[in-house]
From Swiss-Prot:
The organism of origin for this protein: Methanococcus maripaludis (strain C5 / ATCC BAA-1333)
Keywords: ATP-binding, Cell cycle, Cell division, DNA damage, DNA recombination, DNA repair, DNA replication, Ligase, Magnesium, Metal-binding, Nucleotide-binding
Active site: K252 (n6-amp-lysine intermediate)
GO molecular function annotations of the record: ATP binding; DNA binding; DNA ligase (ATP) activity; metal ion binding
Protein name: DNA ligase
Broadest EC class assigned to this enzyme: ligase
Length: 573
């Protein structure tokens, strides 16, 4: 399949803002592949359309930043001066390369047009290049691709290298296109995607005529992690009880979400970003290996513990453990980790359609019970032990007063609050559900992405000291909600400045526009209405709590979250 045929439809998708038209154009693309291509082509275009060449569960990236792409573009014959001027004018490196493509060295008239397969496999190889001369090799490969490409192709190649297609397409739109073209139930398609995290595989199976509901490759599998189910905000414990009848309360831990997979004695542990962190936490791996369980997927919260007090250490200590590549055992002696398991998603078969109460029974057979109302003495004793693997502390009750006691106790041992779950609910990967709620004592912190950075003043003059922060809407468009600089230490500023220099897209002098890759957790005095920002809200006195290296743009808060927090706080006043 010619890459140009794909790019023509990408161009149509980019030029419309209407969701239904984007869906129709992707249906047109599927039909073109059905007639002229191979099943694997739908796999490739499904991933490329959302700016990826790897499936999400693979947790691989092309690994090329804007600076390296600029270096590659310069070797094609486009001058740095012209390129920077065009980027400033258009705000997009892809469009800039397209507009300047007449300056790119010409190849022989007898050269073959670029194929989709060739472009796709070439970009996958980029991620594998390592060693002393790796940057030169990457520049040469990118340069050769751009020289072979026509102007429109060069636009999309440049964007894909940065994993940002800028065409307004997302997974739900592709799934809607699959549903329309192949005449399959949209909910079934969404559910299968949720347990595979592989839009390309799903597309390839559909166009090949697979019975997707009974295809074992499309079922939940050990060592293929899934996105976590997410909780809703709730104004109060009483409101959550109304929604969930007799709910299951659990301590909301001050830690990082993890998935533990085990099969044939092998253990892998994944972060909420689906990163394989197994090698960073060897002591947890060894403990899990000791337990007589196999062919299982567990979910829990990994907490860095102060064993002398039984309380959690700062969240950054968890990230220090997860990032560690050397002297891991020495770091393990300094920072003890513990996992509180709260769900089992697979045990010899998929369990996500099984009610929570039954999944919890399986979990407790493996790790024991921790019922707060009847086992408090045991729980408080074990908190101070060196035990590494626990079932989460829980309370089943519809008594709001008892629930508030449990909430206050959870705070007293250093954690964030409580989770409130419907015991009859299934597990819905990657969705924010109305069967699970969270309650915290203070305003909900927000996870935001940095979209611009500005050089600091005074003591901060050597770093980027102020950061424009944004949340996303349902279509994954970003909306600015404020600027933040307070709360960052000099070490934070130094680390952020280094990252900014690697991911800046456009230099405006004292300010730079960035790829949306830095996630910050921020607190604030309140959310207020504001005409300054298009979204209509702004954070008052935002302050950085921590840099969330365990999260990506997929994990940031939404415009709906902001509105909900605003409404909750307004009703409390």
């Amino acid at each position: 399949m010619l890459f140009n045929d794909f790019c023509k439809i990408l161009d149509k998708i980019e030029k419309t803002t209407k969701r239904l038209e984007k869906t129709d154009y992707f249906v047109e693309l599927i039909d073109f592949i059905k007639t002229n291509g191979k099943p694997e082509n739908l796999k490739q275009v499904s991933q490329i359309t959302i700016g990826r060449v790897f499936a999400e569960f693979e947790n691989k990236e092309i690994g090329i930043g804007p600076n390296l792409l600029l270096e590659a573009v310069k070797t094609t014959g486009i001058s740095e001066k012209d390129l920077k001027a065009e980027i400033k004018k258009t705000g997009d490196i892809g469009t800039a390369v397209e507009n300047l493509s007449s300056n790119i060295k010409q190849v022989s008239l007898f050269s073959q047009p670029l194929t989709l397969e060739e472009m796709y496999s070439t970009l996958k190889k980029l991620s594998e290049i390592e060693g002393n001369s790796s940057q030169k090799k990457k520049i040469r490969i990118i340069s050769n691709l751009l020289i072979l490409a026509n102007p429109v192709e060069s636009r999309y190649i440049s964007r894909l290298i940065l994993e940002d297609m800028r065409i307004g397409m997302n997974i739900p739109t592709i799934l809607a296109s699959f549903s329309n073209y192949f005449n399959v139930n949209k909910e079934n398609v969404e559910k299968i995607y949720a347990v595979t995290n592989d839009i390309g595989l799903l597309g390839e199976k559909l166009i090949s005529g697979s019975d997707i509901e009974n295809d074992s490759e499309l079922h939940l599998k050990v060592f293929r992690p899934i996105k976590p189910m997410l909780a809703q905000l709730t104004p109060s414990i009483e409101d959550a009880i109304i929604e969930t009848k007799i709910p299951q309360f659990e301590t909301k831990y001050d830690g990082a979400r993890v998935q533990v997979h085990k099969s044939n004695g092998e253990v892998k542990i994944y972060s909420r970003r689906l990163e394989d962190i197994t090698n960073s936490v060897p002591e947890l791996v060894e403990e899990i290996k000791k337990i007589d369980i196999d062919n299982i997927i567990l979910e829990g919260e990994c907490v860095a513990m102060d064993l002398s007090s039984g309380k959690p250490r700062p969240f950054q200590d968890i990230l220090r453990r997860f990032r560690r590549k050397y002297d891991i055992n020495k770091m393990a002696e300094k920072i003890a980790l513990r996992i509180y398991f709260f769900d089992v998603l697979y045990y010899n078969r998929g369990l996500i359609d099984t009610p929570l109460r039954n999944r919890r029974e399986i979990l407790e057979k493996l790790f024991g019970t921790n019922d707060w109302d009847t086992e408090l003495e045991k729980i408080e004793k074990e908190i101070l032990s060196k035990k590494m693997l626990f079932s989460s502390f829980k309370l089943n009750s519809d008594d709001p007063n008892l629930a508030k006691e449990f909430f206050n106790w959870s705070l007293s041992i250093g954690h964030e609050g409580v989770m409130i779950k419907n015991p009859d609910a299934p597990y819905t990967p990657g969705s924010r559900v109305k069967t699970m709620y969270k309650v915290k004592p203070t305003l909900e912190n927000l996870d935001v992405v940095v979209t611009r950075a500005k050089i600091g003043m005074g003591k901060r003059k050597d770093w980027y000291g102020s950061y424009e922060i944004s949340v996303k809407d349902d279509e994954s468009n970003l909306h600015v909600i404020g600027n933040v600089g307070s709360g960052l230490t000099e070490d934070d500023l130094e680390r952020l400045t280094k990252i900014v220099n690697e991911i800046k897209i456009e230099d405006l002098g004292e300010e730079v526009i960035l790829e949306p890759k830095i996630v910050l957790e921020v607190t604030y005095e309140e959310i207020q209405t504001s005409e300054k920002y298009e979204m209509g809200y702004a954070l008052r006195f935002p302050r950085v709590v921590q840099i969330r290296e365990d999260k990506s743009i997929n994990d940031i808060n939404t415009l709906d979250d902001v509105k909900k927090i605003y409404d909750i706080e307004r009703n409390r006043k």
